[in-house]
Amino acid sequence: MKRTIVIPALLLLAASAVAQTTSAQTTPAQTKNPVSTALRDILPGRQKNTVAAVEAMPADKFNYKPSADQMTFGRLVTHMVETNDLLCSKAAAVPAAKVEEIKDTDSKDNLVAALKASFDFCSDALAKMDDSKLEETTEGFGGKQVTRAWISMVLAGAWSDHYAEAAMYLRLNGVLPPTAKK
């Protein structure tokens, strides 16, 4: 009888030890700046996919809009540039990028260059960011005071949202989005 209790108990103990060892091996290393580190880690993939999506859209489709109420693809790209410049500067507490004004009707080459420059600005800004300023407030949308942590979360969400929008525009024009090609 004791044997029937001891053997399962030992097996359970061994399984628990293996699970803890496996868990410890897959847990990411602790960092003093988890939010800013996460943004820096996420940025290269979002940049690669978003720039590739914009580059994939034929130049003659930059004036395409899915419906009368939606923005053109060119406007979507200028929105991405404006968002990157604004949110990366606010999240990292650095001055906004000094860039030439772009228009929705600019050439594809100009819009792609502006988008790349905005992601480069984000990379530089986020390299200076640390989590010690996340509790600081800054002006958000509509003049509302928000924390840099709030801005950081909106920034990460915006990158995903913008790629998803670009992918939808591509599909509506018969173009396969970059992440669908894998």
Describe each region flagged by the PLM:
Residues 49-52, 56, 117, 121-128, ...:
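Solvent-exposed, charged/polar functional surfaces in cytosolic regulatory/catalytic domains
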Residues 1-2:
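N-terminal secretory signal peptides that target proteins for export/translocation
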Residues 60-61, 132:
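Secondary-structure boundary/capping positions in well-ordered alpha/beta enzyme cores
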Residues 40-44, 48-54, 61-100, 139-182:
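Short, contiguous alpha-helical
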Residues 5-13:
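Sec-dependent N-terminal signal peptides
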Residues 14-19:
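N-terminal signal peptide c-region/cleavage motif recognized by signal peptidases
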Residues 20-38, 82-144, 173-182:
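Short, helix-capping/interhelical loops that line the mouth of catalytic, cofactor-
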